Amino acid sequence: GGISVPGPMGPSGPRGLPGPPGPGPQGFQGPPGEPGEPGSGPMGPRGPPGPPGKNGDDGEAGKPGRPGERGPPGPQGARGLPGTAGLPGMKGHRGFSGLDGAKGDAGPAGPKGEPGSPGENGAPGQMGPRGLPGERGRPGASGPAGARGNDGAAGAAGPPGPTGPAGPPGFPGAVGAKGEAGPQGARGSEGPQGVRGEPGPPGPAGAAGPAGNPGADGQPGAKGANGAPGIAGAPGFPGRGPSGPQGPSGPGPKGNSGEPGAPGSKGDTGAKGEPGPTGIQGPPGPAGEEGKRGARGEPGPTGLPGPPGERGGPGSRGFPGADGVAGPKGPAGERGSPGPAGPKGSPGEAGRPGEAGLPGAKGLTGSPGSPGPDGKTGPPGPAGQDGRPGPPGPPGARGQAGVMGFPGPKGAAGEPGKAGERGVPGPPGAVGPAGKDGEAGAQGPPGPAGPAGERGEQGPAGPGFQGLPGPAGPPGEAGKPGEQGVPGDLGAPGPSGARGERGFPGERGVQGPPGPAGPRGAPGNDGAKGDAGAPGAPGSQGAPGLQGMPGERGAAGLPGPKGDRGDAGPKGADGAPGKDGVRGLTGPIGPPGPAGAPGDKGESGPSGPAGPTGARGAPGDRGEPGPPGPAGFAGPPGADGQPGAKGEPGDAGAKGDAGPPGPAGPTGPPGPIGNVGAPGPKGARGSAGPPGATGFPGAAGRVGPPGPSGNAGPGPPGPVGKEGGKGPRGETGPAGRPGEVGPPGPPGPGEKGSPGADGPAGAPGTPGPQGIGQRGVVGLPGQRGERGFPGLPGPSGEPGKQGPSGSSGERGPPGPVGPPGLAGPPGESGREGSPGAEGSPGRDGSPGPKGDRGETGPGPPGAPGAPGAPGPVGPAGKSGDRGETGPAGPAGPAGPAGARGPAGPQGPRGDKGETGEQGDRGIKGHRGFSGLQGPAGPPGSPGEQGPSGASGPAGPRGPPGSAGSPGKDGLNGLPGPIGPPGPRGRTGDAGPVGPPGPPGPPGPPGPP
């Protein structure tokens, strides 16, 4: 046995189905060899963590080799265009795990090539139906990423055991359609690094099997949200090459690594759980530190060694695919039963080392799990419930009072306006620096392979809970619907940082504080959709990332412009009758009649009896009602005020139609619950309505008591004169002053005023203080809820002030002169004319209400004269108070009776008539309808980022995935060495009697 010189490591082929166990007995373990010197090539990129195996027994520690120096990182590879999606293949049955071959001596490590660019993502899963979009808030800025911890140093490997013969190759399954990704689980910290066992004796290196054909990558479509990780399939036994001869003791060159055994196919994905209610999704928080590695699994029995294979050259990494759009989480597939294993392929020749590739961008962190065909796409999850309405803005100021009109019927609601422009998402937070990788320890010889681990049960659900929705804010003022904005461009993902060197395991860093919120971007236009790129090679599955912290609540959207004023509604119902108008003035008194001719002077006769009281005049016709005064401003509908002075309330103003709802603000993640804004200023009280039509006239006043009789003059009584003739009619006295206006009568039938126009809207109130929201739990994006019902109408305003009375109606035309009124109190007697020369006939006093005729006082004795003939009786003057009797003149010689003296001054005014009956109170106008609720105001300002919520529970297992396409047949393995003889088998049962054989040849003749 010479020392086998290892060739460079070739790229790993696709994982085949495990073959059934071979029939050979287990080989004997060779003596342990000395560990080889470690290679000095650069360390390659770290692969995704595999499923933890069972812990093997720790062997004796091998001597560690020198750590190789790490080469400089290559430049970042360009990002590939998304390829077209591949068709999902049928899923193959699961094969049995083959036994591993023993690993040969490790040779010195060759120079490590530069890491290739990451492969593109596979075909996306089917998107579930999109829910109605919720309102979108402004995204908060991502917090800074936490620093990555250092990886622990690897322990020495234990010695390998003998391997069994390889089984026949299994058929590769077709690639299944990628299932919908579930929510990304929180990344657990890695377990502690297992202790590497002491290296066993290296066997001869087996020849490497030929690399399988890589499956064609599907075109990456929209990236689905990460699904719940499926249950990992049991890994196949690692293959080991046959042990080489014992090398010389001391640090010799490292042997070639044996070909890995065919991996077991991935089990069917468990049934996909129903998606839970969606929470409010926040931006991802800072990345957590990488956990420690898990303990190493127990080694299984080693198979028989195979011939060493040559390493193939490294494959080129594909360009990373663009991130797809996250789809709703589909149900997990059910677990499938394992299929029979295929035979192990024969090792291929070692390939030459490939050139170092450029480092690719760091792939997205994937869910853990053994690689295998994905499960079938689950049915889309149920539609989410309606999203909660955003917090309303502060109430606007009450507008000025409009003209009060009659309430009209409620107008139809305006059409809702288009949604406002969508805001641009904020820039992503800065990526934290990656920790340096520690230097790798020396590779010891491989230990015996452990048995295949059982498939692990699905882990328990994480402790997260659905975030509770915050309370709704105060209702905002209706805004004018804005134009629908075009969606903003999706921000381009930032470049991934180069991977740092691997350092020693560092302590777990403390999570840094969340970064400040990024500024809100202006709404962008939708960018043109990029062409699909060529499919890239599948990328490695990364370890699951930590649960991100929920982002800050989006800032409040700006309030939309105030809606246009709605058209005036139709004329409202008749309002209550108005107050009585002012009573019309009394018509003028007719002109005086012509004076009679003077009669002969007669003797003064005795005082005649009082004349009869004139008939009561009929009430005059009512004047035309004056036009209603100008309408006052309508006040807002208020609570019923205290009834004012008795009068009929004015008609209520018609409420104008509500303006169309304002545009919806930009949708964003719901912000934190803001404090209720301060109420807006109270609107001014509206003026009272216009005065009502003139009421009916009040009842006629009652007749006043008669006036006092005049006192007799002081002169001595004169001689009784002869009854004179009727004197000439006196002149008509001046018109009496009009009576006072009576109390308002009952409501008149006047027309109602037209509805007043709405007053201008008041200024918006000041926004409320910024609320401090608790940090929400990261949830899945909810499907958009249906539109909420309009809010309840706001509370009624205070009652409006009573408006000023309307102006008096115009004076109506004088009515026709009515019949004479009731007789007034008798006037005082007129004074006699002075005796002597015959005076000119006195003028009649001004007519008043007809009163009793005053007694004539005795005049002073006049000079005796011839008795005059009685004068003719003058026509009765218009009824009016008789003037007071003048003082008696000085005594003179009795003369003939003088002519009738002038009428005395008008008597006192009669008592005011009784107040007419109070008119019935007018019907109260109904309160105006409450205005339609305005659209929600701008959302409140964003609250501070709340603490990270616990992880949500894991969903139930999904349905089984589709069968993968069968893999290519592997090459037949080399026959293993003949094992030791087995135990003796038991004697078999006697078989059935066979048919008689053919007759034999005749025997020799017998002895004579």
From Swiss-Prot:
Disordered: annotated segments: 1-1008
Glycosylation sites: 91, 924
Subcellular localization, as worded in the UniProt entry: Secreted; Secreted, Extracellular space; Secreted, Extracellular space, Extracellular matrix
Gly residues biased stretches: 236-255, 309-318
Signal peptide start-end: none
Modified residues (5-hydroxylysine): 91, 254, 329, 571, 682, 850, 912, 924
Chain ranges passing through the membrane: none
Domain of life: Eukaryota
Subunit structure: Trimers of one alpha 2(I) and two alpha 1(I) chains.
Similarity remark: Belongs to the fibrillar collagen family.
Protein name (record): Collagen alpha-1(I) chain
Organism: Paramylodon harlani (Harlan's ground sloth)
